[in-house]
Curated annotation (Swiss-Prot):
Induction: Constitutively expressed (at protein level). This is Translational regulator CsrA. The gene is csrA. Homodimer; the beta-strands of each monomer intercalate to form a hydrophobic core while the alpha-helices form wings that extend away from the core. Binds to FliW. Keywords: Bacterial flagellum biogenesis, Cytoplasm, Repressor, RNA-binding, Translation regulation. A translational regulator that binds mRNA to regulate translation initiation and/or mRNA stability. Usually binds in the 5'-UTR at or near the Shine-Dalgarno sequence preventing ribosome-binding, thus repressing translation. Binds mRNA; 77% of enriched bound RNA is for flagellin A (flaA) while another 13% encodes other flagellar or motility-related genes. Binds mRNA in 5'-UTR or intergenic regions, binds consensus 5'-AAGGA-3' in the loop of a predicted stem-loop structure. GO terms for molecular function: mRNA 5'-UTR binding. The keyword Glycoprotein does not apply. It is found in: Cytoplasm. Disruption phenotype: No visible growth phenotype, increased expression of the flagellin A (flaA) the major flagellar filament component. Flagella appear normal, the average swimming distance decreases about 20%. Expression of other flagellar genes is not visibly affected unless flaA is also mutated, when an increase in their expression is then seen. mRNA for flaA remain localized to the cell pole. A double csrA-fliW deletion expresses the same amount of flagellin A as the csrA deletion, has 2 wild-type length flagella, a wild-type swimming distance and restored cell pole localization of flaA mRNA. GO terms for cellular component: cytosol.
Length: 75
């Protein structure tokens, strides 16, 4: 992992067409702005993780329901 120090209004460039700018800093947080092509999806990591967790939970629940159903069909 590359770690860089940036002050407010300073930026980094990633590849072609992606700029990440520190907009504001405060105690324990930093607000960043991202300029990127509209074709590039930008998501917060915690939202991606939340969707993964919900999908996993849904699969586990469906497995349990299928197991119950198969037991009823065997009887």
């Amino acid at each position: 992992m590359l770690i860089l120090s940036r002050k407010e209004n300073e930026s980094i460039i990633i590849g072609e067409g992606i700029e990440i700018k520190v907009v504001q800093t405060g105690k324990g947080y930093a607000k960043i702005g991202i300029e990127a092509p509209k074709s590039l999806m930008i998501l917060r990591k915690e939202l991606v993780q939340q969707v993964k967790d919900e999908n996993l939970h849904s699969v586990v629940q469906n497995d349990i329901k299928l197991d119950d159903l198969s037991k009823k069909l065997i009887k």
